[in-house]
Amino acid sequence: MKGSTSLYRKVDLIDTTGATDIANTDYDGAKPVAPGGKLADGVVAAKLSPFLDINDNAQLNRFGLHNGAPNDKNNLSEKWEAMGLVPALDPANPRDFFLIVGNDNDFMTQDGFQAGSSYKEESGADLDTRLLVYRITIPALAN
């Protein structure tokens, strides 16, 4: 974050084909896999492809939302911690899915109910739980 602006909030595609499986190796414990920021010899990284930039203000603005000032109810909060993928079930577009990205309010509310009683967050903060839903096409895997 820089002020109220998130610098990185993205969904990326990761291809593990050809990547080194470090499970049950020395790298699966205390041995660093990238000492000094360089992968150890013989270790091949997974491939990362940028897919969706949640911070895209042009798209957020279409729905009255934004990334950055003013820090109001329509500014996306900082932590987006949930993701789900649901098939669109569209026979004409079988690779289409709904990507649901969400964040909770971390109990920062003025109208909460927990453990059998009402509460108000001490700082006065009142954050909404929010879900963003995208219809996406997942690219076919290369053979």
Residue ranges and their predicted role:
Residues M1-N143:
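Sequence/structural signature of beta-propeller domains
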